[in-house]
């Protein structure tokens, strides 16, 4: 998943915080979030 995190360091920090907060979320949801962010 880390490979998919592209953008500024500040943006990546925000995404990492969200991933940590959502650590209990299933993997499909995380992939969906990352895919949506990458396509934005």
From Swiss-Prot:
Keyword set includes Calcium: yes
Tissue: In the lung, expressed by alveolar endothelial cells. Not expressed in tracheal endothelium or alveolar macrophages.
Annotated GO MF terms: calcium ion binding; calcium-dependent phospholipid binding
Domain of life per record: Eukaryota
PROSITE patterns registered for this protein in UniProt: ANNEXIN_2 (PS51897)
Name of the protein in its database record: Annexin A6
GO cellular component term of the entry, any: melanosome
Post-translational modification (record): The N-terminus is blocked.
Described function: May associate with CD21. May regulate the release of Ca(2+) from intracellular stores.
Cellular localisation: Cytoplasm; Melanosome
Annexin repeats by residue range: 1-4, 21-40
More details: Seems to bind one calcium ion with high affinity.
Major site of localization recorded for this protein: cytoplasm
Keyword NADP recorded: no
First and last residue of the signal peptide: none
């Amino acid at each position: 998943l880390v490979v998919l995190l592209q953008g500024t360091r500040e943006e990546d920090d925000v995404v990492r915080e969200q991933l940590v907060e959502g650590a209990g979320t299933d993997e499909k949801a995380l992939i969906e979030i990352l895919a949506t962010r990458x396509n934005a």
